[in-house]
UniProtKB/Swiss-Prot annotation:
Active site: 159, 182, 250, 253, 276, 285
A Pfam family recorded for this sequence: Phage_int_SAM_1
Record text on subunit structure and interactions: Forms a cyclic heterotetrameric complex composed of two molecules of XerC and two molecules of XerD.
Protein name per Swiss-Prot or TrEMBL: Tyrosine recombinase XerC
């Protein structure tokens, strides 16, 4: 049970989240449930009515016991982290309203969330996406831009940041594209004619003149296209055509690797094409020639024609 003054503080906190922080009702409900769970545990832990004094004097042992209980109850690492974040949010609010001094709770680190690999799309979902991303909207060059960018990410396995950095200089070589990836590591990827021709077609109707060293993918007003803008286009695509919720720009890069593997490419060649961190370690033991990469690519890739 809670002291009446705490109940009033919780109501004020909820209003603050909605009116001052612009949180959605669903988010506030989730936060309220997390805080309720914490305060109920505090009530159980202290075996008495929770008061303002309990809130002020809560110690690390209680908080860690609460986190351990959530883990025992099979809460996910993400849910446990959100719960702790909620309680910290509430205490931050108390600092402003009842002048609570900086509290020990802020020194507790959130549990590490498990890093999950993005799911690969099926070949059918990829083909549906490539077919329809150009099929809606009312600005032709923007539609073609979206398709060219999506094809490039999937056909070359690029990160969205890498694809958005492509310039006309990258198009000068008809056979290969040279990418400078994370950690300034260079990798060379065979050009698929299908992807290159689509980009050339897009540049033919792009209403902005670009220097050779300027990124070719532009926003509606001529500035460099931002990842968030393109991801919004993919969200529209998902909604209109009922595509998987996990469809993102990065899922096409992941699908590039998964589909190559399914069609017979070896892991080491895929590592080189993706430019993963482990590439430098792999190169110490095997020197894969560009010609071999091209052969693997042309033999294994499902949209090569």
């Amino acid at each position: 049970m809670l002291d009446i003054s705490i109940q009033e503080l919780i109501k004020q906190w909820q209003k603050y989240l909605i009116l001052q922080r612009n949180y959605s009702n669903n988010t506030v409900i989730a936060y309220n449930n997390d805080l309720k769970h914490f305060l109920e545990f505090m009530n159980y832990y202290n075996s008495e009515l929770v008061t303002i004094n309990h809130i002020k004097t809560v110690d690390i042992r209680l908080i860690r016991s609460w986190l351990a209980k959530r883990k025992y109850e099979n809460f996910t690492a993400s849910s446990i982290a959100r719960g702790l974040s909620t309680v910290k949010n509430f205490y931050k609010f108390l600092e402003k309203t009842i002048l609570l001094n900086s509290h020990i709770i802020f020194s507790i680190k959130s549990p590490k969330k498990a890093k999950l690999l993005p799911k690969a799309l099926s070949v059918d979902d990829v083909l549906i996406s490539l077919e329809h991303i150009e099929g809606y909207g009312n600005v032709k060059w923007v539609e073609l831009r979206n398709k060219a960018l999506l094809v490039l990410i999937y056909a070359a396995g690029l990160r969205i940041s890498e694809a958005l950095s492509i310039t006309k200089l990258h198009l000068q070589n008809l056979e290969f594209i040279k990418i400078i990836g994370k950690g300034s590591k260079e990798r060379i990827i065979p050009w698929l004619p299908f992807a290159r021709n689509l980009i050339t077609k897009y540049l033919g109707i792009l209403p902005y003149k670009l220097d050779e060293n300027e990124p070719i993918f532009r926003g509606k007003h001529g500035k460099k296209l931002q990842p968030s803008v393109f991801n919004r286009e993919l969200i529209k695509l998902k909604r209109v055509y009922g595509l998987p919720e996990y469809l993102t720009a990065h899922s096409f890069r992941h699908s590039f690797a998964s589909h190559l593997l399914e069609y017979g490419a070896d892991l080491r060649s895929i590592q080189e094409l993706l430019g993963h961190k482990s590439l430098s370690t792999t190169q110490k033991y095997t020197q894969t020639s560009i010609k071999h990469l091209e052969a693997v690519y042309n033999t294994a890739y499902p949209i090569k024609k």
